[in-house]
Amino acid sequence: KPQTKELMHLCMRQEAYLEALSHLQSPLDPSTLLAEVCVEQCTFMDSKMKPLWIMYSNEEAGSGGSVGIIFKNGDDLRQDMLTLQMIQLMDVLWKQEGLDLRMTPYGCLPTGDRTGLIEVVLRSDTIANIQLNKSNMAATAAFNKDALLNWLKSKNPGWVSGPGIGSLSFPRGVEWEGLACQN
């Protein structure tokens, strides 16, 4: 609701809040310094628990980018963190074997059994949105197995049909033998 968002912005503009929330090390990545809250970019996310999307200007010299953190209250992020740690581990192992799937596992830090922080991955989208946008029928979007493949192809025009995992196609010139999965 616009009124709720404006009240949140009004609260965050108070000097005490700006001072407390500025010039911090990111709890998700201590090597990242969070300069100042970009109040106008902060919002509530459109989901049941209304997570708070907080955007910061990045204090890193010359980076000039923004850093986002989602604060969630009411969700248990401990399983999310474990899953993401397993994905990070698999990504490292795959890269050691020469397989770079270009993954960006985001940071997740439970701060309690029902609260926590999640790293915002800029210029990304959810699988649900991809399925909805790349499917012909919204009612069956979640069951459309081609939606994700069509999205991958639209983002990677150099990819061609060939051997791969399931029906996924891979870039030309990459050795993918031995990676096919049994269905």
Regions found by a protein language model. Name each.
Residues 2-7:
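Eukaryotic intrinsically disordered, low-complexity, charge-rich
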Residues 8-181:
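Conserved ATP-binding subdomain of kinase catalytic cores across diverse folds
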